[in-house]
Amino acid sequence: MNEGMLWYDNQGNVDIKDRIISAIKFFESKYGYVPEKCFVNPATLENPIELNDKTKVLPNNRVIVNHFWLEFISE
């Protein structure tokens, strides 16, 4: 995990995929491009998620539950 944006979303009644898509849309509106990676707590990510060919969703123990770490494009 390098530089990025931390997103908090505690809407437990909303599908995790939809929550991540909302975070990605905000990230794109703020920075002008989609994040390269989205890290989530392994407890939140029960199954692998396929979103698009640009953003990889990966588990990481360093991310707190209900948070998403959206990583900037590496140079």
Listing of model-derived features with the role each one plays in the protein:
Residues 3, 34-37, 66-67:
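Short, surface-exposed beta-edge/turn micro-motifs
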Residues 10, 40-43, 72:
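Short beta-strand-to-loop capping motifs
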Residues 29-34, 52:
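Short secondary-structure junctions
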Residues 36-39, 46:
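Amphipathic, hydrophobic secondary-structure cores in small proteins
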Residues 44-46, 56:
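Short, basic interhelical loop/turn and adjoining N-cap
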Residues 52-75:
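C-terminal edge-of-domain segments
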